[in-house]
A protein has these predicted regions:
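C-terminal accessory module of base-excision DNA glycosylases/AP lyases that mediates lesion recognition
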Residues: 1-41, 138-139, 153-238
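Helix-loop segments that flank and shape redox-cofactor active sites
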Residues: 38-51
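Residue-level marker of regulatory loop/turn positions in helix-turn-helix DNA-binding domains and
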Residues: 48, 52, 134, 148, ...
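Alpha-helical scaffolds flanking conserved acidic
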Residues: 49-53, 89, 93-97, 205
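Short, aromatic/basic-rich helix-turn unit that serves as a nucleic-acid recognition element
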Residues: 54-58, 62-63
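Generic alpha-helical structural context detector
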Residues: 56, 73, 77, 116-120, ...
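Active-site phosphate/pyrophosphate- and oxyanion-stabilizing loops and adjacent acidic/basic residues
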Residues: 57, 73, 143, 206-207
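Alpha-helical ds-nucleic-acid-binding substructure associated with the helix-hairpin-helix region
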Residues: 63-64, 68-149, 213
């Protein structure tokens, strides 16, 4: 599960308690996990354009949260003379800036190329606006955004769940979701060494996930919680 960013947050655009009630009724084993881990505490960050959210995702890829946040802040600060304090650069600003400006912020060559490709594809309409994306299906959004260099299906699925608040996304390739599924449904023990053959397969998850529609994002959130529970990071409700 992506690390939460600092800053203002908002509620999801759906009622999590409705999702929890439906999931508990549809899947008794999931209901037991929900009882052990408590209610949904998911919060979304303030709304961003797809361009801004994906730019941040690119910067955060394969980095610890603190290091990524520092690089992101440096990049934003480098554009302050053009954009003002705290404002995100536009796609055109990113295309026009010299490589040295981005390199000085701590960005690698691959991330610079990915950011410039994101900017170009935003300007040519491949990356939709926030208004347009709200009218698109999850699969349409994925199809559009994975055309950007450095953006794969998993990154878009995380954007759908944690930025756009889409309720019915099942990221079957996410390690945490696969492990949480194995802990909850396949008998994986919290102390057991995890090997690939012990994790849930795509087919197993998709089959059971049919029970969870149209709330698969919330079910996925509970798979991550199952991992936290196994690691002793959750105090179970009394």
């Amino acid at each position: 599960m992506p690390r939460p960013r600092s800053g203002p947050t908002r509620k999801p655009p759906y009622d999590p308690s409705v999702a929890v009630a439906a999931l508990s009724a549809a899947d008794p084993k999931l209901a037991k996990l929900i009882e052990r881990t408590g209610p949904v505490t998911l919060r979304l960050p303030s709304q961003q354009s797809p361009f801004e959210a994906l730019a941040e995702s690119i910067i955060y890829q394969q980095l610890h949260g603190k290091a990524a946040a520092t690089i992101h802040a440096r990049m934003l600060a480098s554009f302050e003379p053009l954009c003002g304090l705290g404002n995100h650069p536009s796609p055109q600003h990113l295309l026009d800036c010299p490589n040295e400006q981005l390199r000085s912020a701590g960005l690698s060559k691959n991330k610079m190329l990915a950011l410039r490709d994101l900017a170009a594809k935003t300007l040519d309409g491949t990356v939709p606006t926030l208004a347009a994306i709200k009218k698109m299906s999850d699969e349409d959004i994925i199809e559009h955004l994975i055309q950007v260099r450095g953006i794969g299906r998993w990154t878009v699925e995380m954007l759908l769940i944690f930025r756009l608040g889409r309720p019915d996304v099942l990221p079957v390739d996410d390690y945490g979701v696969r492990k949480g599924f194995a802990l909850t449904f396949l008998g994986l023990k919290p102390t057991q060494k995890v090997t690939p053959d012990l994790l849930a397969t795509r087919e197993q998850m998709e089959r059971r996930g049919k029970k969870w529609a149209p709330w698969r994002s919330i079910a996925s959130w509970y798979m991550w919680r199952a991992c936290d529970l196994a690691a002793g990071k959750i105090v179970q409700p009394q």
